Amino acid sequence: MNIVMNIVETLKQDYQRFPINQTYSIYADDVYFQDPLNKFRGVQRYKQMIKFIETFFIDPKMDLHSIERLGDTIKTEWTLHWNTPLPWKPRISIPGWSELRLNAEELIVSHIDYWNCSRLDVVKQHFFTKNN
């Protein structure tokens, strides 16, 4: 049961400091990742994606709203924020959730992100504020 608590606690800590110093050891080497923009396999590709966010986005932040484990599945609800490196530096927000599946060794073998908005909604945030 200690391992069960550890992965949830590790994920909570990773969300708090996202995208800095993520704990990649909780992922299987061949982890499957999918979100509305990407679909790939492998922890190295996952590391590259997180490094891209860390390098090119301004002030990225992940607010964790909830985390729940049921059997071999962990569900998180979150909002990802960042400023895009455009001259007017718009603040972007993507609310969503993740479904993480664990193997028998308690490693994440599947990480699928879902957004509560469309890709077009994200593009629009770069040019229109909610007050317009």
Placement of each model-derived feature along the sequence:
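C-terminal and inter-domain tail/linker signature
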Residues: 1-132
